From Swiss-Prot:
GO MF, one annotated term: cyclin-dependent protein serine/threonine kinase regulator activity
Function: Binds to the catalytic subunit of the cyclin dependent kinases and is essential for their biological function.
Annotated GO CC locations: cytoplasm; nucleus
Protein's name in the database: Cyclin-dependent kinases regulatory subunit 2
Keywords from the named record: Cell cycle, Cell division
Length: 83
């Protein structure tokens, strides 16, 4: 069985992004033409820290999942926990 591959993070002014490449045997578990919730992508084996959202489907290559989260998410999340 192939392994799930994670890209490095990349950024714009609002979000940090990463893409996740699924091996064929995992990709076939994806529902067609819809965004997955966090519980769904975790259930198929994608492992990431909190805050990531599956936000788009790359139609030419549906086995590549596109994720984003707001810049500074982790710092803001940790500050809320500390309160």
């Amino acid at each position: 069985m192939g392994q799930i591959q994670y890209s490095d993070k990349y950024f714009d002014d609002t979000f940090e992004y990463r893409h996740v490449v699924l091996p064929p045997e995992v990709a076939k578990l994806l529902p067609k033409n819809r965004i997955l919730s966090e519980s769904e992508w975790r259930a198929i084996g994608v492992q990431q820290s909190r805050g990531w959202v599956h936000y788009a489907i790359h139609r030419p290559e549906p086995h590549i999942m596109l994720f984003r989260r707001p810049l500074n998410y982790q710092q803001e999340h940790q500050a809320q926990i500390a309160k």
